[in-house]
Amino acid sequence: MKRLPYLLVVVLILLLAACGAAGPTTNINVTLTDFQFTPNQFTIPAGQEITITVTNTGAVVHNFIIMKLGTTAGATYEDDDDANVFWAERDIQPGGDFSVTFTSPTEPGEYEVICRTEGHIASGMVGKLVVVAGE
């Protein structure tokens, strides 16, 4: 009987340790200019909380769109590309910004990031989100 309280304490400690806090949020800052993303490639851990802050320092409206793994928008973004979007923020006015927190894709790989405004992909507004397996 004396072992039971000791055993319960050990089990409780193990359970609490298994429920440890989630890892820290990864913060990414992206600047949109005419016509590029800075940085144009960023790496994040898979399945983790991510905060992306995007600032448009350009003179025209831009968008920030993450395509699904294995898909691209091609030379231009068409309406049927909407089915291939992992996450999108549209119409970021010049001088505007936004910040969003979401769970990153769980599948490691390279995800295309684009501005879908007409002519912007062809002008070089294409970036890369690299998702790596968590530790």
Annotated model-derived regions:
Residues M1-L8:
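Bacterial N-terminal signal peptides that target proteins for export
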Residues L15-A18:
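C-terminal motif of bacterial Sec signal peptides marking the signal peptidase cleavage site
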Residues P24-I50:
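N-terminal edge beta-strand
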Residues Q36, W87-E135:
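Extracellular/periplasmic metallocenter environments
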Residues N40-I65, F98-E107, Y111, V131-A133:
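Beta-strand cores of secreted/periplasmic/IMS beta-sandwich domains, seen most often
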Residues H62, A75, H120:
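Histidine-centered active-site/metal-ligand motif
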Residues K68-G70, I121:
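Solvent-exposed strand-loop boundary residues in beta-sheet-rich modules
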Residues G70-D80:
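Short aromatic-acidic-glycine turn motif
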